[in-house]
Amino acid sequence: MKNRIQQLSFFFSLFVFSTMYSQYTDIINSNKPGFSESPYSVGTGVYQFESDFFYKNTSTKPTFSKPHTFGVDLFFRTSFFLEKLEINTQLTYQRETIDNDFNDGLSKFTLGAKYLLFEPVYKDATKEIRSWKKQNTFDKRRLIPSVGLYIGMHTDFLDTIHKKNSMSPKVGVLLQHNLTNNLNIVSNVFYDKIGTNSSEIYYVISTTQNFGYRWSGSIEYQEIFNKQQ
């Protein structure tokens, strides 16, 4: 028997609103806010830290308890060898409250890597100086997504209550459609906690529109299919 968890999220952000960075570049390549992940690396020689806070009030089982979870995600990204290859680490520290009982500690410590397998090349419409139509016609090649592959491993260096006494892999396919210079759609499919009783398959779709140098808005949908423990 499987559980289905659906989540719809809206984000309206002002530059560095819900994410903190330690980086100096002209353009920040971030996966935050939200849960989707771009197939693109941060680039060689970049050391980037991202973080956000979360609050969950959900229950995947028909019980009378009302679990609440509050925590922080820490994400470190860098690239040592290749422009297309990124090495990353994700840590999650959370506090769970069920009725009058609570526990807190490190609930996730994941080491991962992603590689950009394919990136389409688009027409440079600005060079079409003699034709307004060619300058403004939609480039059908933008329907072809950039493709990335993610491989990660959940370690067991966790707080006692979250320990599984084993490690488990995570794999995913990362897609990004750049429909315009300011509008993109990111789609992810992951197979997580492979080989465990809590293994799950989930997908995330997020659309982001840039309104200017500082403002952007996004909408995201996530659905999770997991085993019932």
What are these regions (language model features)?
Residues 23-229:
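Transmembrane beta-barrel domains of Gram-negative outer membranes and organellar outer membranes
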Residues 1-28:
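Bacterial Sec-dependent N-terminal signal peptides
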